[in-house]
A protein has these predicted regions:
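FAD-binding subdomain of flavoenzyme oxidoreductases
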Residues: 1-99
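C-terminal substrate-recognition/cap domain of FAD-linked oxidoreductases
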Residues: 64, 70-213
């Protein structure tokens, strides 16, 4: 969820100890931050799920725990507008996370858990943005909101005013999988270039409507 801020988990793995199928023990990268010597086999083993060997030890890089967060949810009329909102947020804010969900998913979550909708008006899509709750970021997020409204990218929005409200807004996104599991949906974790996401979403929607009317 926090890839925008922290990157992928693999980027935080400084070293691995691995047992291969032949019983050899490999010490990969030796916990070095900078290592330009030869092939970096560490990244071959990350995600290999045991096919190349058994990882029995990992050294992870740590960082300071994040400060309390401010969470925003914006209503968006078109999928393509989500990309523009993301660009504005990244250019003006230190974004921790950026997620989106559709109104169908939101309606299921709200109905199943008796949650409150983020605001009265409904939109086809919603953008959820998380940032650190600092004075500068909090002031800037209102500028982001105004800019997105002026450019007609969002129709409505809410900015959390407390930790409890921030958690409640996250629940709207995080509880989607739990809410939909008994419908037995087809689920995939697919990576798509940001520039191709609008086209991908449109193509998938047309394919689903054609095959599952």
């Amino acid at each position: 969820i926090n890839v925008i801020r922290y990157g992928m988990t693999r980027n935080w793995i400084l070293g691995l100890r691995v047992v291969t199928g032949s019983g050899d023990i490999l010490n990969l990268n030796k916990s070095l931050v900078k290592n330009n010597t030869g092939y970096d086999f560490r990244h071959l083993f990350i995600g290999s799920e045991g096919t190349l060997g058994i990882i029995y030890e990992a050294t992870l890089q740590l960082t300071e725990p994040p400060k309390p967060s401010t969470v925003c949810v914006f209503g968006v009329e078109k999928f393509a507008y989500l990309i523009e909102v993301l660009k504005i947020c990244k250019s003006m804010l230190q974004v921790n996370a950026f997620e989106f969900f559709c109104n169908n998913a939101l309606s299921r979550v709200v109905g199943a858990h008796q949650y409150q909708r983020p605001f009265d008006t409904e939109s086809p899509f919603y953008a959820l943005v998380e940032l650190e709750n600092t004075e500068i970021e909090t002031e800037t997020v209102f500028e982001v909101y105004s800019k997105c409204v002026d450019e007609k990218l969002i129709t409505d929005g809410v900015i959390s005013q407390s930790i409890d409200q921030a958690r409640a807004l996250w629940r709207l996104r995080e509880d989607i999988s739990e809410t939909l599991w008994h419908f037995q949906p087809y689920k995939n974790d697919i990576s798509v270039r940001i520039s191709k996401m609008a086209d991908f979403s449109n193509d998938v929607s047309q394919l689903i409507q054609k095959n599952y009317p």
